[in-house]
Amino acid sequence: KGKPWPKQEESPTSKAPTESPWLSKTAVLANTWPGSEDSLIFLWENRRKPNEIFDNKAQTPRYCNGRLRGLAKFDRYHAMDLTGGTFEVQGIDQMLLEACLRTNQLALEAVVTTETISPELTCPIITFSSEQGSGNFTLVQKGDNLVFHLRTAKTDADGTKPETTLYRIDAGQPNHIVVAYHPGRLVCYVNGKRVFSTVDMVGNFSNWSAQRLLFGGEWGGKQDWAGQLEGIAIYNRFLSPEEAKHNYAHYAKRLKARQPVARFVVRARLREKTQMPTIAKLQEYARALVVHTYDVQNALKGDPDSGRILVAHWVFLDRQPVLSIDEKRVGQLYRLELERFDDNPQLESEMQFNDCQEFDLPFFYDVSPNQKTEGQKSATKL
């Protein structure tokens, strides 16, 4: 079974009067996610989906695209895995700004899974900013809390005063988050239930300025968030409780249907290396895998059922060489965390280099942590 959805409890301080009737009016909801494309400005479900919004004015679809940066990659469910990197959205910034200025309303929806909880941690997850201290809105992980900064005519330059703490999160647990605002009301729904609501947030967006939409970090910031994002939708309208519940219910079905995959940890001796490709061989690709042959010495977790295996490693990420792979030497022992290659369908469309003579061996994918690109060393030798 997939990961369970955590229970939510609304804190006493988050209680507020029931939404006014006009706020509870729900758009006609289709039997899917999202339930309505009314006032939908940005949509990114996962890499396999078209991520398109039909433009009624132009009578054509508009596609929401972006680029992985740093060590970011896609996971087996085609979600953004932003550990060590970011997802840079393309062609949406001015449209998002103008849309929100027209309505002075905003709704941010996403499925968020954090990998790390630490009291010292402060990492932006979703930002519409251009530098630290000047964002229009920011969803932040601060310790084990989700925090929201919203810039209005009644707040400071980046919406951090007042800072709004929305919800406490747990590592490894997917949460469907909706944060919705109109002047005089800020509300947060987690997994279809209201967990925070306040009437103290006021002001329009007249002080908003041109910014950049980024996932996994903040423009000009040094801290990268570690976790996965998917099911992202941004609207220039307030979302009703009914719509938040509807969207959660439909996305939850997809996540609950997912099955965990086997993870292996082995000590293995590098037997044969594929020659390191040059960046010129990537052509238009930003990422590439290289395949090596290993002789398994010890199985520390799980049993790969073979004494000799093929392992695919990232050799380029964001067109930068992964030095931990280039540093590997034939005859050396390495500790590897692995998954079966076939359990990672997101790799099918990635460029792959393989010179290994024994091409029919069991095939695995290296998921070892702490991979670094050029200028940083991370090969783990035993």
Model-derived features: positions:
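Extracellular, beta-strand-rich glycan-interacting domains
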Residues: K1-P4, I41-P50, A107-T116, K222-Y251
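Flexible glycan-contacting loops in extracellular carbohydrate-active proteins
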Residues: T198-L229
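Structural detector for short beta-strands of small beta-barrel domains
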Residues: A262-E284, V290
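Extracellular glycan-interaction surfaces
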Residues: Y63-T86, E109-S118, T138-V202
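Disulfide-stabilized netrin-like
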Residues: A288-T380
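A carbohydrate-recognition surface predominantly in extracellular/luminal proteins
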Residues: D38-I41, L97-T116, G135-L139, Q173-N175, ...
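Extracytoplasmic low-complexity segments
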Residues: K1-F87, D93-A99, S129-E131, K245-A257
